[in-house]
């Protein structure tokens, strides 16, 4: 994880958003006489300003390559961002083609989608581009719509399995040889977007933690052509303190007699509540279950150590304690929540 570069990345992206909001112009493109369409940045800005979020995560992938041959349409995208399990709610192709496309009056379109990792800049310019087929399916003309000047094709079903099982693409790449495509002298300019609207899986919701950290990891892996989540975890553990001094759960024995509660608590008289102690690294990793706020704070702490306080080692998961005690002459059995620390993290 190149966490030391993230603040500069965030700053550059924010500057781009500000500049794009002020100067972005509609592309002079037309599709079957439709009006010109807003640029990808302008479209994402319109979603950003939408007061009603459509999904937890909305991604726009610009096509690496596009081929339209009659009723056979081929699209290549870089899916290297795949890392965490997500539930795909909706996926659509938004086409802003540079020349008019005459759709057939009947029949269907054959759509083929490939994963094409961004080429290694160190490879020879005459080397081929490797592609891996993700799906081949048909789209009926009734599924083709127009929105904001773009031709829109709904492609949720073919792509949902890849987001549901992100490791499947990596396994396929290791098992099946990809197709070799000649590398163009200059990157092709395409105006085809794949819009992915996805929600965090139930497992991710239960785990909690920093969604921003996951996205930062995903962004860096995509830039470096890495698909493995483990890759990011291994490379993030540099410049850490001694692991024995990091935030962790330690024993913490509670004796109710010492605090004067032993007269009315029947059982237990003592129990191990555990507590949290230790340092929080900067930046903090997902193993410490940071919130988004804590993750940003830990990044700033690394660059401004004298101005920003460290995140605190504190309980992030607790469990109840069953207690038998006397209350107004009655013996009660009650389960009191948040009495025992199960996991510690940096908040």
Curated annotation (Swiss-Prot):
Function: Essential for mesoderm formation and axial patterning during embryonic development.
Main localization (coarse): secreted
Cited Pfam families: TGF_beta
SUPFAM superfamilies referenced in this protein's UniProt entry, alphabetically: Cystine-knot cytokines
Similarity annotation: Belongs to the TGF-beta family.
Identification of the protein by name: Nodal homolog
PANTHER family, alphabetized: NODAL HOMOLOG (PTHR11848:SF159), TGF-BETA FAMILY (PTHR11848)
MF (Gene Ontology): cytokine activity; growth factor activity; morphogen activity; type I activin receptor binding
Sorted UniProt keywords: Cleavage on pair of basic residues, Cytokine, Developmental protein, Disease variant, Disulfide bond, Glycoprotein, Growth factor, Heterotaxy, Secreted, Signal
Positions glycosylated per UniProt: 72, 199
GO cellular component: extracellular space
Gene3D superfamilies: Cystine-knot cytokines (2.10.90.10)
GO biological process, one term: inhibition of neuroepithelial cell differentiation
Signal peptide positions (record): 1-26
Localization of this protein: Secreted
S-S pairs: 247-313, 276-344, 280-346
UniProt cross-references to PROSITE patterns, sorted A to Z: TGF_BETA_1 (PS00250), TGF_BETA_2 (PS51362)
Membrane-spanning ranges: none
Species, as recorded: Homo sapiens
Disease (UniProt): Heterotaxy, visceral, 5, autosomal: An autosomal dominant form of visceral heterotaxy, a complex disorder due to disruption of the normal left-right asymmetry of the thoracoabdominal organs. Visceral heterotaxy or situs ambiguus results in randomization of the placement of visceral organs, including the heart, lungs, liver, spleen, and stomach. The organs are oriented randomly with respect to the left-right axis and with respect to one another. It can be associated with a variety of congenital defects including cardiac malformations.
């Amino acid at each position: 994880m190149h966490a030391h570069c993230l603040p500069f990345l965030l700053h550059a992206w924010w500057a781009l958003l500000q500049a794009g909001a002020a100067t972005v112009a509609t592309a002079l493109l037309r599709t079957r006489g439709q009006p010109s369409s807003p640029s990808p940045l302008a479209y994402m800005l319109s979603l950003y300003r939408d007061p009603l979020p459509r999904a937890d995560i909305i991604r726009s992938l610009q096509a690496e390559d596009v081929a339209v041959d009659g009723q056979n349409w081929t699209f290549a995208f870089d899916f290297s961002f795949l890392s965490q399990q997500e539930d795909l709610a909706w996926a659509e192709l938004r086409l802003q083609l540079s020349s008019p496309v005459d759709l057939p009056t009947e029949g269907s379109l054959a759509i083929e989608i490939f994963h094409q990792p961004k080429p290694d800049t160190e490879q020879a310019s005459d080397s081929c581009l490797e592609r891996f087929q993700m799906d081949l399916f048909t789209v009926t003309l009734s599924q083709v719509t127009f929105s904001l000047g773009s031709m829109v094709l709904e492609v949720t079903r073919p792509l949902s399995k890849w987001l549901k099982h992100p490791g499947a693409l990596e396994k396929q790449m290791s098992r099946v040889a990809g197709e070799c495509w000649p590398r163009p002298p200059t990157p092709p300019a395409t105006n085809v977007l794949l819009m992915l609207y996805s929600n965090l899986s139930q497992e991710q919701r239960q785990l909690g933690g920093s969604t921003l950290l996951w996205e930062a990891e995903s962004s860096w892996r995509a830039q470096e052509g890495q698909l493995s989540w483990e890759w990011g975890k291994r490379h993030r553990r540099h410049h850490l303190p001694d692991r024995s001094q990091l935030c962790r759960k330690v024993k913490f024995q509670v004796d109710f007699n010492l605090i004067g509660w032993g007269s009315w608590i029947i059982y237990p008289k003592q129990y191990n509540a555990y507590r949290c102690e230790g340092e929080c690294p900067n930046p903090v990793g997902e193993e410490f279950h940071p919130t988004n706020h804590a993750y940003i704070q830990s990044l700033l702490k690394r660059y401004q150590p004298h101005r920003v306080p460290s995140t605190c080692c504190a309980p992030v998961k607790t469990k109840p304690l069953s207690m038998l005690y006397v209350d107004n002459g009655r013996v009660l059995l009650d389960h009191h929540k948040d009495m025992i620390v199960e996991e510690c993290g940096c908040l």
